[in-house]
Amino acid sequence: MPFLEAGGAERFGLTTEEVALAVASHSGEPAHVATAESILEKGGFSAADLRCGATPPSDEASAAAVVRDGRPFSPLHNNCSGKHAAMLLACRLLGFDPATYDDPAHPLQRLILARVAFYAGHPASKIEIGVDGCSLPVFRLPISRLAAAYARLVAPGMLDDESPAAAKARRRAVAAMIAAPFHVSGTGQFTTRFLEAGAGRWIGKEGAEGVYAIGVAAPRLLGIAFKIDDGAARPRFPVAIDILSRLGIWEGGVPESLSGDVRPAILNARGLRVGEVVAAVPVEARADAAKGPPGDPVAGRA
């Protein structure tokens, strides 16, 4: 967000797809790799400058193609390469040292922490900092504050105490997610289909260890966040659909493109359906209009 606030997208001529990749957890497909490379080139950087580490693409077909071609896995395949590339450009723009952009004490990371605190409505001094899987600082928040942040992200107009530049940056990030869902996630992924189905009414994004967060702009402003306690990934999407169903967000029922995620099948080695994943745990919901941002933060654990 500090990069967009400072006019980085305009300064480096980033496309909508490149902005979307900068806020993505992508699946490492060839189009994602090419987009990350394009971001880097616009700032005079290369894959060698990324500090996210080399990983296989999470997209199985793409990973198999890399192995089949005898190519090494690259930091560009890392699902966070887009945001790392954008951080390098932010350093170039703001005059910061790009070699240590992942250090929690780096001035760019301090700016990012301040924006997280602002949108979450939570003091920066109370946010604990760890190290994420991609080596960037990761911020520990109450789950209700993550929900509040997503409500603020999709809120119309300007928020209280939000600068015009910050509001413009926020709207640009959200607009990119809506316009380029594939670049936020990947082929066939839930988040891609979820963004497409929303048609501008909501955004959503997964996090590691069973986290999912949603910002709903219509039919009413809502922020939703939850974490699967044991960190499992497979319950996230049925839980997300179940919460939205309970809140009456779907108009005309669950979109057809998401119907397979309502109760995903568990298949055995022969492809026989032997079970299903069911969202069956009540979700705690609470709204705190006095302390939180506009909209209802809905938080839960499953």
Predicted regions and their residues:
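General structural feature for long, well-ordered alpha-helical segments within catalytic domains
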Residues: 32-36, 84, 108, 112, ...
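Generic secondary-structure signature for well-ordered alpha-helical cores
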Residues: 9, 41, 45, 93, ...
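Active-site-adjacent helix/loop patches that line small-molecule binding or acyl-intermediate pockets
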Residues: 14-126, 134
